[in-house]
């Protein structure tokens, strides 16, 4: 998401920063890079949302630093119920440019995947940890 955020910030003439998954072990040991002022309004840009875990961690770090997180934008989301629920519980509003269902529908319509693959793909989206979607393959 950093490259996408940098481009968006540049095109809109806005400042840009990013949140590390953990603080650096050298230098100033910052977790948040870039200028962030108390009460500053922030939109998080992600490349992908699946379970929502990394997005929620990012939002929590920004909130702890005093930012007002308006929401998040992602390029793609799997649209997993677990992720939707977690984001709602954390009070994170997220919108995505496209999602798993749309990509599967277009891929099927354009002949990139056969129709018989669609149920397995939807089973994956519903529960990736249930390997039955693999049709017996591992």
Predicted regions and their residues:
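PRPP-dependent phosphoribosyltransferase catalytic core
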Residues: 60-138
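Short, glycine/charge-rich flexible loops or terminal/linker lids adjacent to PRPP-binding catalytic cores
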Residues: 2-43, 51-57
């Amino acid at each position: 998401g950093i490259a996408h955020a940098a481009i968006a910030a540049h095109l809109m003439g806005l400042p840009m920063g990013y949140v590390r998954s953990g603080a650096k072990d050298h230098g100033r040991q910052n977790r948040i890079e870039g200028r962030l002022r108390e009460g500053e309004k922030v939109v998080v840009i992600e490349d992908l949302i699946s379970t929502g875990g990394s997005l929620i961690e990012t939002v929590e770090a920004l909130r702890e630093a005093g930012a007002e997180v308006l929401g998040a934008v992602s390029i793609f989301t799997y649209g997993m119920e677990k992720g939707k629920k977690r984001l709602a519980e954390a009070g994170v509003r997220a919108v995505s440019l496209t999602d798993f269902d749309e990509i599967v529908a277009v891929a099927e319509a354009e002949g990139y995947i056969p129709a018989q693959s669609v149920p397995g793909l939807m089973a994956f989206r519903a529960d990736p940890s249930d390997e039955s979607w693999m049709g017996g393959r591992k």
